[in-house]
UniProtKB/Swiss-Prot annotation:
Similarity comment: Belongs to the UPF0637 family.
Record lineage: Bacteria, Bacillati, Bacillota, Bacilli, Bacillales
Cross-referenced InterPro entries: UPF0637, UPF0637_domain_sf
A Pfam family that the UniProt record links to this protein: DUF1054
Protein name: UPF0637 protein OB1420
Length: 205
């Protein structure tokens, strides 16, 4: 299993859409394929449900190169954006590991309501966890700063999102060790499985 190197992070300093996309495809996507296939297999076993690997294509982009790239694991073979999904991705200064609920979710309000009703479970995750309210931005808040109003916004505002998990900063030694990194990612996803399952159950009600 291969980890991530400084060269992978430097991909996002390359100017030009075609040039950056070529670097993403040659440097990062082979690692996503390797990590993602194992994640899909391991998470399928843990959820007792078939999960599928998706790798971001950035196909809608015509001018601006992407600032980050990611893999997604979801229970739908055709796509992931309309479903609760797991994400591993790279910005220029960190790797993110998310349970992701983004604005395309058709049952967003149901899932948000379930999370509000189980708010204590959300807050019981380790304090090292972070939350993003917009997947396009680097910013994340500490789980300790999360309150119900964030989830109410996620419920009520069409474009609002909720992603929860961990960041690993560029330069952290674990990134270079693929096997250790994989175990770290799996540990995060295992801790997030109850919230994933709650989202799936709420979606399917």
């Amino acid at each position: 299993m291969n980890g991530f190197t400084n060269k992978d992070f430097e991909t996002f300093n390359i100017n030009g859409l075609d040039e950056r996309m070529e670097a993403i495809q040659t440097r990062i996507q082979p690692k996503f394929q390797q990590i993602g296939e194992s994640l899909a297999e391991d998470l399928s076993k843990k959820t007792n449900n078939e999960l599928y690997l998706h790798i971001a294509k950035h196909a809608r982009r015509t001018v601006n190169p992407p600032n980050d790239t990611w893999l997604a694991i979801a229970d739908n073979k055709r796509g992931y954006k309309k479903h609760p999904h797991f994400q591993v991705g790279v910005f220029d200064d960190h790797v993110f590991i998310w349970l992701a609920l983004i604005y395309e979710l058709p049952n967003k309000s149901k899932i948000a309501s379930a999370y509000i009703n189980h708010f204590d479970e959300v807050k019981n995750l380790p304090t090292s966890y972070v939350v993003s309210l917009d997947h396009t931005k680097k910013d994340a808040i500490s789980l300790t700063d999360l309150n119900k109003s964030h989830l109410e916004r996620f419920r009520d505002v069409k474009k609002a999102e909720f992603l929860i998990g961990k960041h690993i900063e560029k330069g952290d030694p674990i990134l270079a060790n693929g096997d250790e990194l994989y175990q770290f990612i799996m540990d995060v996803f295992e801790q997030l499985l109850p919230l994933y399952q709650l989202a799936i159950d709420s979606r399917d009600e």
